[in-house]
Amino acid sequence: MRSYYVCSWHAAKMMARQKSGLIVMISGYTGVTYTYGVLFSATKCTVDRVARDMAIELEPYNVATVSLWQGLTLTEKAKDNLAKAADKMTGSVAGQSGSSVEHPGRVIAAMALDPAIMDRSGGTFITAEIADAYGVVDVDGRRIESMSAKRGSPLWGPVRENDYHGR
């Protein structure tokens, strides 16, 4: 959690000066469903909350913060684990086709170009669903499916949606 906060703090200082920016924190479905254990789940819940609270503090500077739930990302390590022990993987991974490591970057790039990004600030979003909203596909042309029906949905919407500013 410390690295999320420290990196965001430094980025926010630069972005606030220029009165624009987007900070994206990568989280996951484990924010609402058991995945790898208490510490992992608690950390991801905290990531979502930090993105939300930062949105409130950074709104006057036109800096947006969001948390994205990525789901299964086919990193080299994930591919290796699936090849070695797919039968032992948790139910949280079963049934997911996964995305390339490039997919979230494509989604973040689309978000960064959105002139209305502040309307999403403070929200937690499923990367696959945001990809659909922006028309983003994976490097092989596939549409990545949301796992929300099986794994749950985010708790936090954008701060502007509820006009919530902690007052």
Regions found by a protein language model. Give the residues of each.
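Residue-level detector of anion-binding/catalytic polar loops
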Residues: 64
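A structure-centric feature marking long, well-folded core domains of fungal metabolic enzymes
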Residues: 6, 77-78, 106
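A glycine/serine/threonine-rich, flexible loop-to-helix segment
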Residues: 60, 69-98
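Short aromatic-enriched loop/helix-cap "lid" or pocket-rim segments at secondary-structure transitions
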Residues: 37, 77-81, 134-139
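Hydrophobic positions on the long internal alpha-helix
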Residues: 3-11, 50-51, 111
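C-terminal helical subdomain
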Residues: 67, 87-167
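Catalytic loop of short-chain dehydrogenase/reductase
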Residues: 5, 16, 22-60, 70-73, ...
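A short helix-coil junction within the Rossmann-fold of NAD(P)-dependent oxidoreductases
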Residues: 10-19, 114
